[in-house]
Amino acid sequence: MVLSQRQRDELNRAIADYLRSNGYEEAYSVFKKEAELDMNEELDKKYAGLLEKKWTSVIRLQKKVMELESKLNEAKEEFTSGGPLGQKRDPKEWIPRPPEKYALSGHRSPVTRVIFHPVFSVMVSASEDATIKVWDYETGDFERTLKGHTDSVQDISFDHSGKLLASCSADMTIKLWDFQGFECIRTMHGHDHNVSSVAIMPNGDHIVSASRDKTIKMWEVQTGYCVKTFTGHREWVRMVRPNQDGTLIASCSNDQTVRVWVVATKECKAELREHEHVVECISWAPESSYSSISEATGSETKKSGKPGPFLLSGSRDKTIKMWDVSTGMCLMTLVGHDNWVRGVLFHSGGKFILSCADDKTLRVWDYKNKRCMKTLNAHEHFVTSLDFHKTAPYVVTGFVDQTVKVWECR
């Protein structure tokens, strides 16, 4: 940088003042002579302490610049990742923000599953302590405990009205609870091993369950009878989930596959095999996301003119995969977690994917650009489960350290 003659003269006089006032007489004399300075009292007063002032000002400005750069980078990140720009951002783009709103304690063993009630402002957690707990997610208050299972409760599911809750357990049973009276109204026996997953079908008439006995069973809600058994997996079936209209169910297993079954015929419609380890979790894409998925992946539209259905899977191979069920093709693989992926689901707005893992993080993915856009260091221990509220701006996570956390989205 080139200084003007005036700036150079001011700098030289400030240096001369600094040398003289700090006792560097010899250096002052030499510098004054070489810089050809004509010093007098008036000028001396003007430049007294000027060099020190300039120096401290530069340091102060540097600090300010660094702070502003940091804020600018944060603002850029918020802008690109759907952050809070006043209240103008579309709620469909709201994502969880740290810190958590509540950290809820009460379970005496690791939390295995967390879900929101479809109607009321409550959420439910299941645990290895054999209990199910009900919490108010708006106030953080504990409401009640449902007891009945004799071993770890592995999964829970509401019907669409929220009047019935299904649970399954390592005690090899499935229980149906009246969520208005909080009583167990039915217990179903039939699996020969740990029942790892349960889901109430969209019509509310049937329940599906998956087990370590390698089977998937369908049960009648009214009678508790097992009406269908789906066989094909070669190892422990980890999770089962029905699609939106209940015509298909998806399952994932220790055999490293994801299978899609036609409910009416029990036929295995697709066997999806690209994971390299146990597949822990699956989630169907909501129909609201079909067009953006098709656009992001370039997947072909079927003869019917409708894209999809699409499915997500998370695995111990640390990846998340998106599948086109109609073709059996893996559309994308999301890489970023550093440990087993334990939960995955679509954001209710359809544009993002949320996941949790044993790397202690909760992540938000922009699948259109195939990148992780937000990482929340959720806890000091493994994150076992997550759920995203369909209408309210909340995410809930469960942890191995026995706690449940509620996150606000904005």
From Swiss-Prot:
Transmembrane regions: none
Protein keywords: Acetylation, Cell cycle, Cell division, Coiled coil, Cytoplasm, Cytoskeleton, Developmental protein, Differentiation, Lipid degradation, Lipid metabolism, Membrane, Microtubule, Mitosis, Neurogenesis, Nucleus, Phosphoprotein, Repeat, Transport, WD repeat
GO cellular component: 1-alkyl-2-acetylglycerophosphocholine esterase complex; axon cytoplasm; centrosome; cytoplasmic microtubule; kinetochore; microtubule associated complex; neuron projection; neuronal cell body
Gene Ontology biological process terms in this record: brain morphogenesis; cell division; establishment of mitotic spindle orientation; germ cell development; lipid catabolic process; microtubule organizing center organization; microtubule sliding; nuclear migration
Modified residue annotations for N6-acetyllysine: 53
Positions of the LisH domain: 7-39
Cell location: Cytoplasm, Cytoskeleton; Cytoplasm, Cytoskeleton, Microtubule organizing center, Centrosome; Cytoplasm, Cytoskeleton, Spindle; Nucleus membrane
Region annotation (Interaction with NDE1) ranges: 1-66
Biological role stated in the UniProt entry: Regulatory subunit (beta subunit) of the cytosolic type I platelet-activating factor (PAF) acetylhydrolase (PAF-AH (I)), an enzyme that catalyzes the hydrolyze of the acetyl group at the sn-2 position of PAF and its analogs and participates in PAF inactivation. Regulates the PAF-AH (I) activity in a catalytic dimer composition-dependent manner. Positively regulates the activity of the minus-end directed microtubule motor protein dynein. May enhance dynein-mediated microtubule sliding by targeting dynein to the microtubule plus end.
Note: Originally the subunits of the type I platelet-activating factor (PAF) acetylhydrolase was named alpha (PAFAH1B1), beta (PAFAH1B2) and gamma (PAFAH1B3). Now these subunits have been renamed beta (PAFAH1B1), alpha2 (PAFAH1B2) and alpha1 (PAFAH1B3) respectively.
Protein name: Platelet-activating factor acetylhydrolase IB subunit alpha
Gene this chain is encoded by: PAFAH1B1
